Amino acid sequence: MNPNQKIITIGSVSLTIATVCFLMQIAILVTTVTLHFKQYECDSPASNQVMPCEPIIIERNITEIVYLNNTTIDKEKCPKVVEYRNWSKPQCQITGFAPFSKDNSIRLSAGGDIWVTREPYVSCDHGKCYQFALGQGTTLDNKHSNDTIHDRIPHRTLLMNELGVPFHLGTRQVCIAWSSSSCHDGKAWLHVCITGDDKNATASFIYDGRLVDSIGSWSQNILRTQESECVCINGTCTVVMTDGSASGRADTRILFIEEGKIVHISPLSGSAQHVEECSCYPRYPGVRCICRDNWKGSNRPVVDINMEDYSIDSSYVCSGLVGDTPRNDDRSSNSNCRNPNNERGNQGVKGWAFDNGDDVWMGRTISKDLRSGYETFKVIGGWSTPNSKSQINRQVIVDSDNRSGYSGIFSVEGKSCINRCFYVELIRGRKQETRVWWTSNSIVVFCGTSGTYGTGSWPDGANINFMPI
């Protein structure tokens, strides 16, 4: 082999070795980087259970790879397994209620495009709370807002915003509805939306953004539902619906829905004579509702729903300090737990209460005749003792000189217990305020607290003279 061939051979071998070494270095670098960034490994969940994420410890030739802390690199996260809500935690023990939210919709309408609404309510998923209301298909500063005192028109839609966000022009219209209820089962939202002719309305059941089922009027007399949140336990949601006379016997049915599909319908049973606009809350393993008797009683009906066998019972709140409006004064009002009290029972307003052992927390208008003012208090023995009237922990939410309206309950699951919250509808405009032609509302929201609290009043606050006519 001549000298030139030797040089070429040595060069080729050297180049080959260098290339192999270079490729090995790249492979080592890629492996090191991959192992460094893959800090957590998530096993696929089996049987719908969450599997813990554990650090991977890797040893190579007695060299421990140590993961760096405080890096700016996003770590891989285990996917959360979505489960149905079961509401099995106990009810929070509270001393009263603390301010939570106020949307100031009417005040903002004086200078902005805000929807005309009524029948508001609040409901929460796992992460956030949302406010709902039935819009009138118009903003307030719009001639279409004239005569919006009417409840049922084909332009009404269910509006949904994050709690505290007024219903502006960008608000989502969930469905067509002049009566509604909404709840989250842990996986998706269910909306019950009623619209159509008074004598032949349709209830649409919308789950996870899709229409899944429907039901038509069964008594041809204004099919209607709660105007507050429904309740879901272990994937089954329940909602109370009524069709029939608003001042006489009506046909109330309790529907059970799974992922938007009606799976069972139970008739109302028990001693309640008339049931409308129920405010429902989870009372594991069942659901309990406090409703409106628009026929015979100013004491509120109670509907107990068994979620396992679909059975229903009903009665009345025992408290002699009754919750509906209009009502007798507190000295002459009565309730025997089982029957309507036949005291100014005709007419009424949506309201709420909830049991606390033998006692009952409740809210009502301060006026016994009008939807004015709002107060809350606890009645000792008000859940178990007929005509109990011992009141403690009274709070004024809206002073008696200002208007209120519907009110209802919603539940919020905490780390160790389930808290009860309520909202108050603050109605403005017609019929009482005849300077304007519209009727709309804002809301104020309070939640139960185990702490201390002060005093105040949280009315709508809009100067009617500043408002569009």
Curated annotation (Swiss-Prot):
Catalyzes the removal of terminal sialic acid residues from viral and cellular glycoconjugates. Cleaves off the terminal sialic acids on the glycosylated HA during virus budding to facilitate virus release. Additionally helps virus spread through the circulation by further removing sialic acids from the cell surface. These cleavages prevent self-aggregation and ensure the efficient spread of the progeny virus from cell to cell. Otherwise, infection would be limited to one round of replication. Residues 1-9 are intravirion. It comes from Influenza A virus (strain A/Aichi/2/1968 H3N2). It is a single-pass type II membrane protein. This is Neuraminidase. InterPro entries: Glyco_hydro_34, Sialidase_Influenza_A/B, Sialidase_sf. Its cofactor is Ca(2+). GO terms for biological process: carbohydrate metabolic process; viral budding from plasma membrane. Residues 333-342 have a biased composition (Low complexity). N-glycosylated. Its main location: virion. The influenza A genome consist of 8 RNA segments. Genetic variation of hemagglutinin and/or neuraminidase genes results in the emergence of new influenza strains. The mechanism of variation can be the result of point mutations or the result of genetic reassortment between segments of two different strains. Keywords: Calcium, Disulfide bond, Glycoprotein, Glycosidase, Host cell membrane, Host membrane, Hydrolase, Membrane, Metal-binding, Signal-anchor, Transmembrane, Transmembrane helix, Virion. It is found in: Virion membrane; Host apical cell membrane. Residues 11-33 are annotated as: Involved in apical transport and lipid raft association. It is an enzyme of class 3 (hydrolase). Glycans are attached at N61, N69, N70, N86, N146, N200, N234, N402. Residues 324-350 are annotated as: Disordered.
